[in-house]
C-alpha cells in the first residue's frame, strides 16, 4: 500500500504538476499501509508472547513510554498551535500514533527475541520504525512551519526507513 501512496504522491507532483493536497489519496494509502503490517506483527508477537519475561516486558514498556513521550512532546505543541480542521488534525495525529504502534510492536518483539538468533532482523525493523517516527515528526513540524518541500531531509529519512525495513525483511528471510 505504501507503494500506492508513493505513486499517488508522485502522480500529483510530477504528472499533474500540482502541490499534493493534504489530506489526499496518498494519505489513505499511507495510513492503510500500516494496518496489514501492524496486524502481521501483532500476530507474530502473539505467537511468542509466552517467551516474554516480566523484566523484559518492563524494559519494553519503559522504552515505549519514553519514545511516546518524546514524540508527543514534539507533535502536540505544534499541532495545537495551528488552527486546523478536524480532518487535518486527525490525519496529522494518526501518523505518529501508527508509527508508535509499529515501534512498540518492534520493541516488544525485540524484548522477546533479544539474544536469540532472530534478534538481528528485529533490531533492523526497530531502526526502520524509529526512522519513520523521526521522519513523520519532522514532516509535521515542517508543514506547521511552512518550510516543507518535496525532496527535503524528511523525504530522505523516509527513504532510509524504507531501505532499513527492506534490509530487515531480507535478514529475516535469510534466517530460515
Each language-model region and where it sits:
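Polytopic alpha-helical membrane-helix bundles and their juxtamembrane interface segments
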Residues: 1-176
Amino acid at each position: 500500500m505504501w507503494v500506492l501512496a508513493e505513486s499517488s504522491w508522485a502522480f500529483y507532483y510530477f504528472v499533474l504538476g500540482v502541490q499534493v493536497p493534504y489530506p489526499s489519496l496518498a494519505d489513505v494509502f499511507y495510513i492503510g499501509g500500516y494496518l496489514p503490517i501492524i496486524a502481521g506483527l501483532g500476530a507474530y508477537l502473539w505467537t511468542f508472547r509466552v517467551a516474554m519475561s516480566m523484566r523484559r516486558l518492563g524494559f519494553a514498556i519503559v522504552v515505549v513510554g519514553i519514545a511516546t513521550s518524546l514524540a508527543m512532546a514534539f507533535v502536540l505543541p505544534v499541532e495545537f498551535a495551528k488552527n486546523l480542521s478536524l480532518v487535518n488534525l486527525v490525519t496529522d495525529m494518526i501518523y505518529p500514533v501508527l508509527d508508535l504502534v509499529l515501534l512498540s510492536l518492534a520493541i516488544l518483539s525485540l524484548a522477546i527475541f533479544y539474544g536469540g538468533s532472530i534478534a538481528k532482523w528485529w533490531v533492523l525493523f526497530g531502526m526502520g520504525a524509529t526512522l519513520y517516527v523521526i521522519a513523520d515528526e519532522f514532516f509535521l513540524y515542517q508543514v506547521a512551519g511552512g518550510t516543507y518541500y518535496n525532496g527535503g531531509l524528511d523525504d530522505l529519512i523516509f527513504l532510509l526507513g524504507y531501505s532499513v525495513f527492506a534490509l530487515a525483511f531480507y535478514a529475516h528471510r535469510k534466517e530460515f
